[in-house]
C-alpha cells in the first residue's frame, strides 16, 4: 500500500495465476471425460462357435461404446440356442448376460423329411398294387366277358325271344326270323293252290307224282325249320301246308278217276257207276274249293 492506496499486483503474476487455474480446470474436465469414456466402453462380445455377430447400426465401431447393439447369427445348418439373440452395451457390460452357442439342426430336418418320404413311398406302393390288381382282374374276367357276349350274340342270331320290362309289364321282342320272314319263320309259303289244281286237272297220268313231290318238299322244309325255335304261328302254317298237299292229292286222284270215268262212259254196262263217281267228284271239288278259299286269308295274314 502506498500513500494510503493499494498497490496493484504485477501483471505477470496475474497471468500465471489465471493460466494455472485454467489448465487445472481443463485437466479436471478431461479426466472426468476420460473416466466416463473408459467406463462406457464394452469389451469385444463373445463370438460363438459356428456363428458370429453384426452391429446395429452398421458398421461396427471400435471401440464399442455404450448404446451399441449386436445381433448374433449362426452358420448354415446351425441354430442359435435360445430365442433372444441381441446384446446391448451398458456401463461397460453386455446385457443381458447369457451364454451364446449354435447347435446343429440336421436331426430335426431329417426327422421332418422322413415322414413325407415314407408317405410318398407308401402311396406309390399302394397305387402300383391297385393297378396290378386291376390288371389281374381284367385278365381273369376277360374270357367270361367274351363268352357272355358270344352267348348273347348267338341268342340274337338263333332267334330266341328276348323280353324287356316296360312299365312293369314284360314284353317279348320278336326274334330275327320273325322280324325278317314274319311269323312263318323259315318255312317258305306254298305255291298258289289254284295253279296246283289247274296243273293237276290238266295233267295226264305222267303228272300224277307232281303233287306228292310238292308235298314231300313242303314236309322237308317244315321238318328242317322245325329243328330251330320257331314262332307259334310257324307250326300252324306248316300244318296248313300239309293239309293243302293232301287236298291237292285228293283233287288229283279225283280228276284222274273222272278221266277214267269219262273214257269209260261209252260203255253201257258201267253207266250207273260213272254217275255215282261224277257226283263224288263234284262234292270233292266243292269241298276243296271251299277249303282253299278259307286258307287264302290265312296266307295273307301270314
From Swiss-Prot:
Q: Which gene encodes it?
A: Susd6
Tell me, in one coarse class, where this protein mainly resides. Answer: membrane
Alphabetical list of InterPro entries matching this protein: SUSD6 (IPR042866), Sushi/SCR/CCP_sf (IPR035976), Sushi_SCR_CCP_dom (IPR000436)
Keyword entries, A-Z: Disulfide bond, Membrane, Signal, Sushi, Transmembrane, Transmembrane helix, Tumor suppressor
Where is the protein found, in the record's own terms? Membrane
Leader sequence range is 1-39
Q: Which GO terms describe its biological process?
A: DNA damage response
Q: Which GO terms describe its cellular component?
A: membrane
What membrane topology was assigned to this protein in its record? Single-pass membrane protein
Tell me where on the tree of life, at the top rank, the source sits.
Answer: Eukaryota
Q: Which residues form the Sushi domain?
A: 40-104
Bias regions of kind Polar residues — which residues? 212-222, 256-267, 279-290
Q: What is the documented disruption phenotype for this protein?
A: Mice are viable and fertile and do not show any notable developmental defect or spontaneous tumor development within 2 years. SUSD6 and TP53 double knockout mice show an increase in tumor development and a decrease in lifespan compared to TP53 knockout mice carrying wild-type SUSD6.
The cysteines covalently paired via disulfide bonds are 42-89, 74-102
Task: Report the protein name in the record.
Answer: Sushi domain-containing protein 6
Name the job this protein performs. Answer: May play a role in growth-suppressive activity and cell death. May be involved in the production of chemokine molecules in umbilical vein endothelial cells (HUVECs) cultured in THP1 monocyte LPS-induced medium. Plays a role in preventing tumor onset.
Please give the residue ranges the record annotates as the region Disordered: 202-241, 256-302
Query: What is an example of a Pfam family matching this protein?
Result: Sushi
| Membrane-spanning segments | 120-140
